[in-house]
A protein has these predicted regions:
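Bacterial N-terminal signal peptides that target proteins for export
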Residues: 2-14
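Serine/threonine-rich, low-complexity intrinsically disordered segments
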Residues: 5-6, 18, 502
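Mature catalytic domains of secreted/periplasmic carbohydrate-active enzymes
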Residues: 30-390, 394-400, 407-408, 420-422, ...
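Extended extracellular/luminal ectodomain segments enriched in beta-structured repeat modules
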Residues: 403, 411-418, 466
């Protein structure tokens, strides 16, 4: 072929390519949507993907029978006889938890590690003749089992004579430095909101109050964590990375924005309703963590062995936390021997089996999916992205389309009663209102009308047989981005007694209570 012939062939190919892009716009390079409002950091995204992790309240209170120690307890009282951190972590891992947070120091000031800054620690207890380091054993167990490790260090210290004075802040930060440099990677640092009140305080036996907003100089303390554990998220009533959900009963708001006006909040100084629902116009990405105990109290008490939450209650908590754009932090307290009791272990394994049954088969995975609008008609943002098993891809609409729908179409009428949907949160939380409908033998039927989605929303729906299921985003702050849509048929589980989640007895102080 001569030069002219080659040029004619190349021109013909070019014209075909251009025509294809005109007829099939999906081959165009459609730009991605712009971010909408505050967006999560990488550490926040990694944290929320854990979904379920455990709290381990184990400290002096385990042996005194209290929930909040006064600070003057004798270290000799701390004497676990068969402590086994590997037992804790193996059991939690088997039950599907991805990490655990240990109370390294609670309000009484007793330290589970041999801190160089106080004598009120395991080094003066009978445990291993004063040579023990439970934080070390915990860290080693997490590392061996591939579990994430988190640490709780109470800001309030009822043992210290200098609590309430400026010099205590340096003491607190020194202990924080010990924990964040000596035990490996930490995924979460937990700052409690309980601050100030009566206590031993070096023998003063008095009540002390502090300014919750200014005393701790929180920005300076947060900087210590950022420098020593840059991958860790920090929890408190006001973040800076993760917020308290505003209660310890086990539920996030049905409307739950991962946004908050952070400057208006501080540990121990918070609007609980705002914490529960988040704030659509929030200035920072601050997702919620639901902390709740498997027992009425946070610490082990033998009298509560018959009061461990039931599987239906634990499922309620799961749906009201992970299922409402939050994480689930379930407290599982070791007993006086230093092991998690058999009744708690059994209940957690039953819970794990129940969860597996709830989500055993994704019915949408093999179905066809269509959308009322696709961004730039591009396959990159097509409806099939919500069922491709990859949450890094997503269905998106054109910028000016904020009301749009996805329709899942089955080959045969299919029975389902659960819907799981996720937004693509790296570009922000957008959906304000959505609706779920099913095409049954009697026509289209509305199953749910809800508000926010966020990282994940899971709906318990009535059991229906449908040929099609439609998710309609009715209102959004910007063009909706949906990364995942799944449907399941869960078995019948007896409803939990006494409502969604049983409340803590009035006599048990809240771990985040404001005195």
């Amino acid at each position: 072929m001569d030069t002219i012939g080659v040029m004619r062939v190349l021109l013909r190919v070019s014209l075909i390519a251009v025509a294809s892009c005109v007829l099939f716009p999906g081959c165009r390079n459609t730009p991605p949507p712009a971010a909408c409002g505050p967006v999560p950091s990488q550490r926040q995204q990694q944290w929320q993907a854990l979904e379920r992790y455990a709290f381990l309240h184990f400290n002096m209170n385990t042996f005194t029978g209290r929930e909040w120690g006064l600070g003057g307890e004798d270290p000799a009282q701390f004497d676990p006889t068969a402590l086994d951190c590997r037992q804790w972590i193996r059991m939690l891992k088997a039950a599907g938890f991805k990490g655990a947070i240990l109370t390294a120091k609670h309000h009484d000031g007793f330290c589970l590690w041999p801190s160089a800054y106080t004598e009120h620690s395991v080094k003066n207890s009978p445990y291993k003749d004063g040579q023990g380091d439970i934080v070390r054993e915990f860290a080693d167990a997490c590392r061996a089992e591939g579990m994430k490790m988190g640490l709780y260090l109470s800001p309030w210290d009822r043992n210290r004579a200098d609590y309430g004075k400026p010099e205590y802040i340096e003491y607190y930060r020194n202990q924080l430095r010990e924990l964040l440099t000596g035990y490996g990677d930490v995924f979460e640092v937990w700052f409690d909101g309980a601050n100030g009140g009566d206590g031993w305080y070096g023998g003063a036996n008095e009540t002390r109050t502090i300014d919750r907003n200014t005393y701790y100089d929180w920005p300076g303390t947060w900087q210590v964590v950022r420098e020593l554990q840059p991958g860790a998220v920090m929890f408190s009533d006001g973040g800076p990375d993760v917020r308290w959900v505003g209660n310890e009963k086990g539920f996030a708001g049905e409307t739950n924005w991962s946004l908050l006006k952070r400057a208006d909040f501080a540990p121990g100084a918070a609007d609980r309703e705002a914490l529960n629902a988040g704030q659509e116009d929030g200035t920072h990405w601050l997702p919620a963590e639901v902390d709740v105990s498997i027992r009425p109290g946070w610490y082990y008490h033998e009298a509560e062995d018959s009061l461990v939450r039931t599987v239906p209650q634990l499922l309620d908590i799961y749906y009201a936390s992970v299922g409402r754009n939050a994480s689930m932090l379930l407290n599982v307290p070791p007993d006086k021997t230093g092991r998690i009791p058999a009744v708690d272990s059994l209940r957690l394994m039953e819970f794990a089996r129940a969860l597996a049954a709830e989500f055993s088969k994704d019915l949408a995975a093999d179905a066809r999916v269509s959308a009322s609008n696709v961004r730039g008609h591009s396959g990159k943002y097509g409806a099939m992205r919500v069922t491709d098993g990859d949450t890094a891809t997503y269905w998106a609409t054109d910028d000016d389309v904020r009301n749009a729908s996805l329709t899942v179409m089955f080959d045969q009428p299919t029975v389902f009663n659960r819907l799981l949907v996720q937004e693509y949160i790296p570009l922000g939380q957008r959906v304000r209102k959505f609706r779920v409908e099913a095409l049954t033998a009697d026509g289209w039927r509305t199953l749910a009308e809800e508000t926010t989605i966020g990282y994940k929303r899971i709906l318990r729906l009535p059991t229906v047989t449908a040929k099609e299921v439609r998710l309609t985003v009715e209102e959004a702050k910007a063009c909706p981005l949906i990364s995942n849509l799944q449907l399941f048929c869960a078995p019948d589980v007896p409803a939990s007694s006494g409502g969604t989640v049983a409340a803590l007895p009035a006599a048990v102080p809240s771990a985040n209570a404001v005195l």
